[in-house]
C-alpha cells in the first residue's frame, strides 16, 4: 500500500512539473533555448588542421614568382582535411551511387507505366518491386502526400537490390530498362558490353553567396548612377538587364553533369606515347583502387563534395541525437598551402628542407626528377595515395603524385587584394582554377608549397586529382593544443632521426 501511495505521489509530482509554463521553468530568467550537445566528430579518413596564421607565398629567392605569389601573412580557421587524395575506390562509390539512382529512377518510371499508377499493396513481382515507395498513397503522411502532389517529389525504393546478372532479370520490362544503360551492340569491343557512362549524371545545387552579393552591389551602384548594369545568371546562362530583386534562388545554381572520369586523358595528354594500359584499366581495376582518381574536372570534384555532404547528412537524419554536419568542399588556396606546410613556417616543401631526397638518398615525393626520367624510384605514373611519408599534419602527398584542384580561381594579383582572414578569390567568370602540389609528371619546382599553377575548370587531366576539407565548428582549444603537441613530437622524432 505504501509503495502504491509513493508511486501515485511521484506521478502527480511529474504531472505538476510538466504543466508549468515556459516562464515558470526558466524562473523568468534568460536561459536560452536548450539544444542538443554538439560534439565534433572527425570524418573518416580526415585529419584536423588547427587554424592559425602563416606567411603565404614565396619565401625564397624566386624573384620572377614574387609577382605571382608575394609573401603575405594570413589566418585560416580550423578544418578537417582528407589525409590522402580521393582514391579511385572512393570516387567509384560516388559513381556507383549515381549509377544506381539513375537506374532505380528509370525502373520506377517504367513500373509506374506498367502498373498504370495504381496503388500497390507490396505484393508485386518483377519490375513492380522497384516502383516508387509512395506509389501507394494510403500509408503516406500529410506532408509526404503534399510534396508528392504539389512538387512531384518521389522516393526511390532502395531496399530492393538491383539485379546485374542478365540471366536473372525478373521480366522483360526490367530487361529493356537495363539494356538502355549499356552501349549499343554495334559498339561492343572484345565481346565486353560495358555501361554507357554518359547516362550517369548527377544533379545538385551550388550556392555562391559572395559572388552574388558582389553582383548586387555592382547593380546598386549602377542604378544609383542611372546606368544599365547587366548581371550574369548562371542558371539561364544569359545576361539580365533588369534588377532581379535578388531572391534566394539568385544565390543558387543548378548543375547537372556526367560524373564518370575521362579515361582518355591518359592518351590525349601525351601525344605519340603508349599509355593505353592506363586508359583501359586505371579507374576500374582493383589494382588501382588505392591510387588517386584523375580525369575529373573542377566541377566534378565539386559534385563529389556535394554528394559526400548529402550522404553523410542522410545518415545523420536517421539518428535522433546526431546533428547535421557542415558541407564537404574543396579547400581554398590558402587552406591548401597552410595544410601543405604541416605547421612549418617558411619551408620550401611539406617535409621542411630544401632537398627532395632524404639522408638515405630516397626521393620524398613522386615527381619527375630528371630530364626524361620519370621512374627513377619505379614510380612512372601515380602511386598509392598514402605512399611516402606524411607531413606534420599527417597528410600524404601534399607534394607530387597528382596536382590538386582547389576552390580558388587563378588571379595573378589575388594576393594583393584578398583578405588576410580566410582569403579566397573565386570569380564565377574566371574559368581558370588553381591547382596545387605538382604531380608525377612535373619537375620539383611545382612541388614547392608556395608554387601556383592553374587549369581550366572543364579540362580533365591525367595528373590532376583532388582532396576535400570539412569545416571544424566551434573553437576547441584543447583539440588544437593536442594537435600542435602531436606536430611537435613528430618534429622532434624527425630531428632525432637526422
Residues of each region from the PLM?
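Short capping motifs at secondary-structure boundaries
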Residues: 79, 86, 95-104, 308-318, ...
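Non-catalytic, alpha-helical, charged scaffold/linker segments
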Residues: 109-242
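C-terminal motif of bacterial Sec signal peptides marking the signal peptidase cleavage site
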Residues: 15-16
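Short, structured beta-strand segments at or near domain termini in extracellular proteins/domains
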Residues: 462-477
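Sec-dependent N-terminal signal peptides
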Residues: 5-12
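Short proline/glycine-enriched turn/loop segments at secondary-structure junctions
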Residues: 424-427, 453-460
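Post-signal peptide N-terminal segment of mature Sec-exported envelope proteins
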Residues: 24-51
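Functional-site microenvironments in short loops/helix caps that host divalent-cation chemistry
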Residues: 21-27, 48-49, 55, 60, ...
Amino acid at each position: 500500500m505504501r509503495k502504491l501511495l509513493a508511486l501515485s505521489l511521484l506521478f502527480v509530482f511529474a504531472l505538476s512539473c510538466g504543466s508549468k509554463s515556459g516562464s515558470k521553468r526558466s524562473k523568468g530568467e534568460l536561459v536560452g533555448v536548450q539544444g542538443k550537445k554538439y560534439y565534433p566528430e572527425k570524418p573518416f579518413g580526415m585529419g584536423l588542421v588547427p587554424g592559425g596564421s602563416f606567411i603565404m607565398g614565396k619565401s625564397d629567392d624566386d624573384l620572377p614568382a614574387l609577382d605571382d605569389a608575394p609573401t603575405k601573412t594570413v589566418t585560416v580557421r580550423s578544418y578537417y582535411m582528407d589525409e590522402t587524395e580521393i582514391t579511385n575506390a572512393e570516387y567509384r562509390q560516388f559513381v556507383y551511387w549515381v549509377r544506381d539512382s539513375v537506374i532505380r529512377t528509370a525502373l520506377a518510371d517504367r513500373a509506374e507505366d506498367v502498373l498504370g499508377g495504381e496503388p500497390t499493396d507490396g505484393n508485386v513481382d518483377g519490375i513492380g518491386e522497384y516502383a516508387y515507395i509512395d506509389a501507394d498513397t494510403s500509408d503516406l503522411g500529410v506532408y509526404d502526400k503534399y510534396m508528392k502532389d504539389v512538387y512531384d517529389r518521389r522516393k526511390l525504393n532502395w531496399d530492393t537490390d538491383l539485379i546485374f546478372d542478365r540471366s536473372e532479370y525478373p521480366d522483360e520490362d526490367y530487361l529493356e530498362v537495363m539494356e538502355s544503360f549499356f552501349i549499343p551492340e554495334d559498339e561492343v569491343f572484345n565481346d565486353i558490353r560495358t555501361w554507357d557512362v554518359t547516362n550517369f549524371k548527377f544533379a545538385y545545387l551550388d550556392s555562391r553567396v559572395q559572388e552574388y552579393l558582389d553582383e548586387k552591389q555592382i547593380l546598386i551602384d549602377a542604378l544609383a548612377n542611372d546606368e544599365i548594369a547587366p548581371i550574369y545568371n548562371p542558371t539561364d546562362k544569359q545576361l539580365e538587364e533588369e534588377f532581379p530583386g535578388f531572391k534566394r534562388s539568385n544565390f543558387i545554381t543548378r548543375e547537372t553533369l556526367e560524373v564518370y572520369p575521362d579515361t582518355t586523358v591518359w592518351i590525349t595528354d601525351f601525344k605519340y606515347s603508349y599509355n593505353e594500359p592506363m586508359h583501359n584499366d586505371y579507374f576500374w581495376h582493383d589494382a588501382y583502387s588505392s591510387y588517386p582518381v584523375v580525369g575529373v574536372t573542377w566541377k566534378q570534384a565539386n559534385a563529389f563534395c556535394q554528394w559526400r555532404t548529402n550522404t553523410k547528412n542522410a545518415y545523420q537524419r536517421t539518428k535522433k541525437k546526431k546533428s547535421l554536419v557542415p558541407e564537404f568542399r574543396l579547400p581554398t588556396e590558402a587552406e591548401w598551402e597552410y595544410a601543405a606546410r604541416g605547421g612549418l613556417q617558411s619551408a620550401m616543401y611539406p617535409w621542411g628542407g630544401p632537398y627532395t631526397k632524404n639522408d638515405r638518398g630516397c626521393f620524398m615525393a613522386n615527381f619527375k626528377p630528371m630530364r626524361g626520367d620519370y621512374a627513377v624510384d619505379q614510380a612512372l605514373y601515380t602511386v598509392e595515395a598514402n605512399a611516402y611519408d606524411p607531413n606534420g599534419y599527417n597528410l600524404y602527398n601534399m607534394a607530387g603524385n597528382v596536382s590538386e584542384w582547389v576552390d580558388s580561381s587563378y588571379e595573378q594579383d589575388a594576393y594583393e587584394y584578398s583578405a588576410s582572414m580566410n582569403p579566397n578569390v573565386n570569380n564565377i567568370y574566371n574559368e581558370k582554377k588553381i591547382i596545387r602540389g605538382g604531380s608525377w609528371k612535373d619537375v620539383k619546382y611545382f612541388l614547392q608549397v608556395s608554387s601556383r599553377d592553374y587549369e581550366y575548370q572543364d579540362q580533365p587531366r591525367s595528373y590532376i586529382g583532388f582532396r576535400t576539407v570539412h569545416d571544424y565548428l566551434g573553437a576547441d582549444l584543447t583539440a588544437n593544443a593536442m594537435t600542435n603537441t602531436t606536430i611537435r613530437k613528430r618534429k622532434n622524432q624527425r630531428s632525432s632521426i637526422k
